[in-house]
Amino acid sequence: MSMSDDTHNSLSTGKCPFHQGSHDRSAGAGTSSHDWWPNQLRVDLLNQHSNRSNPLGEDFDYRKEFSKLDYSALKGDLKALLSDSQPWWPADWGSYAGLFIRMAWHGAGTYRSVDGRGGAGRGQQRFAPLNSWPDNVSLDKARRLLWPIKQKYGQKISWADLFILAGNVALENSGFRTFGFGAGREDVWEPDLDVNWGDEKAWLTHRHPEALAKAPLGATEMGLIYVNPEGPDHSGEPLSAAAAIRATFGNMGMNDEETVALIGGGHTLGKTHGAAAASHVGVDPEAAPIELQGLGWSSDYGSGAGGDAITSGLEVVWSQTPTQWSNYFFENLFKYEWVQTRSPAGAIQFEAVDAPEIIPDPFDPSKKRKPTMLVTDLTLRFDPEFEKISRRFLNDPQAFNEAFARAWFKLTHRDMGPKARYIGPEVPKEDLIWQDPLPQPVFNPSQEDIVNLKAAIAASGLSVSELVSVAWASASTFRGGDKRGGANGARLALAPQRDWDVNAAAARVLPVLEEIQKSSGKASLADIIVLAGVVGVEQAASAAGVSISVPFAPGRVDARQDQTDIEMFELLEPIADGFRNYRARLDVSTTESLLIDKAQQLTLTAPEMTALVGGMRVLGANFDGSQNGVFTDRPGVLSNDFFVNLLDMRNEWKAADESKELFEGRDRLSGEVKFTATRADLVFGSNSVLRALAEVYASSDAREKFVKDFVAAWVKVMNLDRFDLL
C-alpha cells in the first residue's frame, strides 16, 4: 500500500487528510448514478410535488383560502400596478399591459394537448427551465413587479392564478371585454420533471413542423413557446411559417380561427424589444450570479431598460394605440406594403414602407415610427386560409373581439380540466366543448341502491377479471397534467373510446352493465362501471382471505356523445398501458418508461404503481387476456403471488425473441417454462428501486398490507376526476 506525499505530510502534521483539498463536499455533488447510467429508469418522476416540498402543509386548502380573497380589491391593485411604472424597469407608454399579457400567454402557451402536460396550471414559469427560456426574456421582471401584490394577498391567491389574472386585467384595462376568469390553479414548489421539452442540447435548435407530430412538443425551436417570429430557422419567409404556426397552435388544440385571433389579439397591445445586439445581454436567471437574486438577462446597453431594453431582439410595434384595444393590427396588416428589414439588434422583421410615421415612441412623445410587423404576423396575410380569416376580422371587428375573447379564455384555461375545478366570481356560465362538459346529476344512489346494484353485478356472471378490467378502462384515461379523462361521464361507452383496441375486453362487458343500468332505472352507467370494479376487487380480496370494503363515492353522471370532442379524446388513447400489459407501438421509448409515464399521468407514487401492477396481474386484467405477468396458479385472487414468484430465484428469465419485449421464466433445474412476462412485469425485479418495493409485497407478512395498499391505490384512480367532491 502506497501513500501520497500530501497524505504523508498531513499525517505527520496531525491533520486529517480527508478534510483537506478543494473537492466539492456538498450534498448531491460528484458523479451521479444518472451520469453513470443515463438510461436509468426515472422512477423519481413519481415522487414529484410531495408534501416534503410543500411549505403550506398537506392540510392547506386553496379553494377555502381563495374564498376569503377580496377579489375586487385584488383586481383594483392589479389595475393600479399597470400604470405604476418603476424606475428599475420602466413601463412602455406608462403601461405594463403588454408585459403582463405576454407573461400570461407564455405561462399558458406551454400546454400540449398530446400529453396534457405544460400550461399555466401550476405556476411553472417561476422555475427552470421555463424561467430561463430564451422566449421568456424579461418575464422575470414581470414576476417581480407582481411580487408586492402576491405578498399582500399571500396564500389567498396562487402565483399560477395571479399570472393569468394579471393578463386578464391588462386586457380589460386596455378596453377589452374578456370572456371570464376561472381561478383554481394550485402552486407547486419545484419544477415539473416529467415534461419532455425535447432532446436538443442548444437553445433555439430548429425543429421541422412534421417532427412535432411524432413527439409531444409544442414549439418549433427549443426554448420557444410556439414558433420563431423571424420564420422557420430565421428564414424571414412569412408563407413558409404557416405550417409551423398550424403545428404549434394545433398542438394546443387551436383551429385556424383561434390561431389568427390569438396572434392578432396578442399583437394588438405592447411591443417587442430589440434596442441593440444580443451580445449586450447577460446570462439567464438560472445562470445569474447570486447577488442578482434570480434576475437574469442584465444588459450593458445604455440603461439596459426602457428604450434600451433588449428582449427578443425584434423591435416591433403593431398598433397606433399600443395601450388601448383596437383593430389596428388587421388594418395595418392589409393597408400597407411590407418590406423586409432588420431591427437594431439585427433580427429580421418587416416595416410598412408606404406608411407615415404614426406609431408613438414608448418613451419619447416627440418621436414617431412606421408600423412594423413580425415575419409570422405577415403569415396571416399571405397564407390563403389565414388570409380569409384575417380579412373577416378586418371587416368585422366585433367578430374578432368575440373570437379573441374565447380563444384567450381557452388558451389560459385549457389545462385546468372540467369546469368543476373553476372557482371565483367571473367563471362563465357557458359550457364549452373543450372543457369536456358533463350533465348535471339527477340521481345519487342511496346505500340501499348501492347494495342492490352490487348484488346485481355479482349475479351477472361477469368474472373478477372482467369487472376489474372495465372499471380500469374507464378510469385510467385520466391525465394529471390537464385533468382530462377519467370515469366520470362513462365515455368508455362513447366514441372514440369504445373502439380503442385496448378496450376490446371492456366493450364486451359494457352491454351487461348497461342492462343492469336499465333495470336500476336511475343509476348512471358511470357509477355502475366503477361499482363493478368495487365488486371485483372485494371478491378477489375475499378469495385471498382478506375481508375489506372498497370505498365508493356515488354521484357520477353519463356524458352525451355531443358533449364529447372525438378528435380531442383520441389524444387520450394510450400508446401503452403497462397496468394492462398493453403496448401499441414499439417505436416510442421503452415499455418500462411508458409504464412510469402512465403512472405519473395517474398521479401515482412508486409504491402505488407497484401495488396496482401486482394486483392487476393476479386478477388477470391484461387487455388481451394473455398470461403475461400472471405469476399465479389462482387467478382472480388478490394475492401477492406476482411478487413472490417474480423474486423467486428458482426461476430464470430469458428473452423469447429478438425484440426483448416478451420473456420466458423457466425452472432453473428442469428448464420447464413456468411463466411468460413483458418488460412491464420484469422491471419490478430488475430496477433496484422497484425491486425494493416488490420485496416489501413479496414478504410473508405482506398479504393483508398488499390488499389494503392495492385498494387504496385503486380507489385513488377511480376518483381522480371527481372534482365535484372538492
Curated annotation (Swiss-Prot):
Gene Ontology cellular component terms for the protein in this record: cytosol
Record keywords, A-Z: Heme, Hydrogen peroxide, Iron, Metal-binding, Oxidoreductase, Peroxidase
Disulfide bond listed as a keyword: no
GO biological process, alphabetically ordered: cellular response to hydrogen peroxide; hydrogen peroxide catabolic process
Family annotation (InterPro entries): Catalase_peroxidase, Haem_peroxidase, Haem_peroxidase_sf, Peroxidases_AS, Peroxidases_heam-ligand_BS
Amino acids binding heme b: H267
Catalyzed chemical reaction(s): H2O2 + AH2 = A + 2 H2O; 2 H2O2 = O2 + 2 H2O
Catalytic residues identified in the record: H106
Tryptophyl-tyrosyl-methioninium (Tyr-Met) (with W-105) crosslink site(s): Y226-M252
One annotated GO molecular function: heme binding
Co-factor remark: Binds 1 heme b (iron(II)-protoporphyrin IX) group per dimer.
Entry cofactors: heme b
Chain residue ranges for the region called Disordered: 1-34
Post-translational modification: Formation of the three residue Trp-Tyr-Met cross-link is important for the catalase, but not the peroxidase activity of the enzyme.
Cross-link (Tryptophyl-tyrosyl-methioninium (Trp-Tyr) (with M-252)): W105-Y226
EC number from the UniProt entry: 1.11.1.21
Chain positions of site Transition state stabilizer: R102
One Pfam family matching this protein: peroxidase
Subunit structure: Homodimer or homotetramer.
Function recorded in the entry: Bifunctional enzyme with both catalase and broad-spectrum peroxidase activity.
Stated family: Belongs to the peroxidase family. Peroxidase/catalase subfamily.
Identification of the protein by name: Catalase-peroxidase
